[in-house]
Amino acid sequence: MGKTVSIFNQKGGVGKTTTCVSFAACLGHKGKNTLLVDCDPQGNSTSGVGIDKSQIEASSYDVLINDVSVKDAIIKTKYKNLSVLPADMDLAGAEIELAENENRFKALKKALAPVVMDYDYIIIDCPPSLGLISLNALTASDTLIVPLQCEYFALEGLSQLLGTVRTVKQHYNEHLELEGVLFTMFDTRLKLNQQVMDEVDNFFPNKAYKTKIPRSVKLAEAPSFGEPIIYYEKYSKPSFAYKKFTDEFLKKQ
């Protein structure tokens, strides 16, 4: 049975989608059959793996709201061992429609159930908010990874995030665990780094990955070409960093 991992931080601009795309691509590259589930209405994970959103026939919205089979919505990408359940702006309306569903917190878990056995890893890109879609993702997940930028304001909301995880564990998914914290957009020139890392260690003891993802122009460029960083610029520092992070993740499994 595959493992489902949500990449989640309710604070935007922390490299969440970049991490989803890069991590999923690295897993596939290392021989793990991987499904990337785009649950962010912006659909950047979808376009980030080369899928034209205007050509999507069925999306995560249709799977959640219109009872479309997840197998009919999944698209196999051109990248090794990597498929995607795409998203588009229709998903923005799903919060309101899910609110009327008596199983509103478990809709995604139910939708993914037919394919959980088909993949080694299912990686979910959550929206940067604590709404119903994010709660669905956490309910459907075995673990979550929190991408975090090493800056003062990045620490805001960590206690709220922990509270959300506790609520999900208590009411919807008792098996949910924190997989780890990944520092992104890391700049070795900033003196604040160590202070933030110490604070994170207080919140999440022994959960921070040793690998840190550097700030890079290449990471910003890759999505516009529909290519994960390990294919767009495979010898770049962020490419090596995401591969190293993936190795670190896999060693703990």
Where are these regions (language model features)?
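P-loop NTP-binding core
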Residues: 1-253
